[in-house]
Amino acid sequence: YNLFGQLSEILTKEINGKTLLADFSLSNQNGFDTKEYYTDETIIYNNKSHNPQVVTDKYSMNTVYIWGYNNMYPIAVIKGATMSQVSSILNEIDKLESMPFPTLATEELYRRLSYIQGALVTTYKFNPYIGITNCIKPNGESVTYEYDSFSRLTSISNNTGVLNKYYYNYKK
């Protein structure tokens, strides 16, 4: 855990098949040798917002998160890229994350980040305190979410048409 109590690393220990789970207890009384453990994930947090910034899985695949709306919602998730690759394309990441509303349109953000060779980019647009309004997936598909005046999801659609519609019927 880091200084803010957030999970920073996940370790796995392989044990022989004869040990019952009920008999297994993790003790750090005398310290433990981390060489016996395998790192499943490493999480690096943003120093200012304390949001996850880079998650590295056990195969060393990075996922970079860019936050927006005053660091409340993720506006981009980039799999297969490093933070330095993302920073070289978006030199205003800190500014983007601290703005109440992103200064880059979702489409422009997606277009810029798609230049990272081999990366899978997903971008998001939100209506704060209501929900997601748009998502552009790695394959370029744009999905739109619509809400009613009570902030309830009413429809999900993409380039081909309406995927789902939601109706809220009340008994009188």
Where on the chain are the PLM-derived regions?
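Beta-strand elements of repeat-based all-beta scaffolds
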Residues: 1-57, 61-137, 142-172
